[in-house]
UniProtKB/Swiss-Prot annotation:
GO molecular function terms attached to this record: NADH dehydrogenase (ubiquinone) activity
GO CC, one annotated term: mitochondrial inner membrane
The protein's name: NADH-ubiquinone oxidoreductase chain 1
Entry's localization field: Mitochondrion inner membrane
GO biological-process terms attached to the record: mitochondrial electron transport, NADH to ubiquinone; mitochondrial respiratory chain complex I assembly
Pfam families assigned: NADHdh
Disulfide bridge positions per record: none
Membrane-spanning parts: 2-22, 76-96, 100-120, 146-166, 171-191, 222-242, 253-273, 294-314
EC id: 7.1.1.2
PROSITE patterns: COMPLEX1_ND1_1 (PS00667), COMPLEX1_ND1_2 (PS00668)
Length: 318
């Protein structure tokens, strides 16, 4: 039974990811006053499957000077980690109920850095290596902010278990008392997933295509699949942490439906931001984190630690 659940989860994620790619192309098309994909199937709905068929049936070319083992392992590792991160998410019942679910997600997501660094180094290309170094510096930097924001939220929920966040938000969303944290979290997830306006790793005018420059066919598709799976995951996590849905034991379907709708709306916002904002300069990207987000999150973390200590002597006001 657990194997069937796992396969169903993976299939659902992969289908959602395929249609997210199509939705992005449609949204970008409409914002640029054109139609987007509309040839394959009705309204272009079969475009993702046509793309997958094309990419996975092409010959995967490998640069003659590349380190073959790492070159092949990197894209597979990226997608494996992206799918692994879904296992502790309660929707409403998690596949694996971990007491340290949030810590697991934070730790496992940081492993994505290895797949990016390996792919850039193993390609033996200057463009790919510079793109990989940029991506690693950016990802590691913004993970600091994500960790501090998570700590602040955990001080309110009192547990690393993701299911505890559902109980914490039974009466009101954590978005309301901690909206500055939510705003910084959302911007940090944009940077963490290398999305516009933080897609410095793919600076076409400077780096051709970033760390995946030398990839083609199947391995190239795996990187894209990992990126879009991570986007959906980050928005699902944002929904769970700041826009918690009340779980009614008599209608678990309602929880799943509301959770999915909120995640889809946040994902649409990701795509809207991509079609609207230009790319940051690299120094602006780093200054935003180290000079703005880090001091702010540290101050808010100290606030969330000090308020419960300062008010611990006050009796319950019932």
């Amino acid at each position: 039974m657990p194997m069937i659940n796992l396969l169903l989860l993976i299939m659902s994620i992969l289908i959602a990811m395929a249609f997210l790619m199509l939705t992005e192309r449609k949204i970008l098309g409409h914002t640029q006053l054109r139609k987007g994909p509309n040839i394959v199937g009705p309204y272009g709905l079969l475009q993702p499957f046509a793309d997958a068929l094309k990419l996975f049936t092409k010959e995967p070319l490998k640069p003659s000077t590349s380190t073959i083992t790492l070159y092949i392992i990197s894209p597979a590792l990226a997608l494996t980690i992206a799918l692994l991160l879904w296992t502790p998410l309660p929707m409403p019942i998690p596949l694996i109920n971990l007491n340290l679910g949030l810590l697991f997600i934070l730790a496992a997501s940081s492993l994505t850095v290895y797949s990016i660094l390996w792919s850039g180094w193993a390609s033996n290309s200057n463009y790919a290596l510079i793109g990989a170094l940029r991506a690693v510096a950016q990802t590691i930097s913004y993970e600091i902010t994500l960790a501090l924001i998570l700590l602040s939220v955990l001080l309110m929920s009192g547990s690393f278990n993701l299911s505890a966040l559902i109980t914490t938000q039974e009466h009101s969303w954590l978005l309301l008392p901690s909206w500055p944290l939510a705003l910084m979290w959302f911007i940090s997830t944009l940077a963490e997933t290398n999305r516009a306006p933080f897609d410095l790793t793919e600076g076409e005018s400077e780096l051709v295509s970033g760390f995946n420059t030398e990839y083609a066919a199947g391995p190239f598709a795996l990187f894209f699949m990992a990126e879009y799976t991570n986007i959906i995951l980050m928005n699902a996590l944002t929904t769970m942490i700041f826009l918690g849905t009340t779980f009614n034991i008599h209608s678990p379907e309602l929880y799943t439906t509301l959770f999915t709708i909120k995640t889809l709306l946040l994902t649409s916002l990701f795509l809207w931001i991509r079609s609207t904002y230009p790319r940051f300069r690299y120094d602006q990207l780093m200054h935003l984190l180290w000079k703005n987000f880090l001091p702010l999150t540290l101050a808010l973390l100290m606030w969330h630690i000090s308020v419960p200590i300062a008010t611990s002597g006050i009796p319950p006001q019932t």
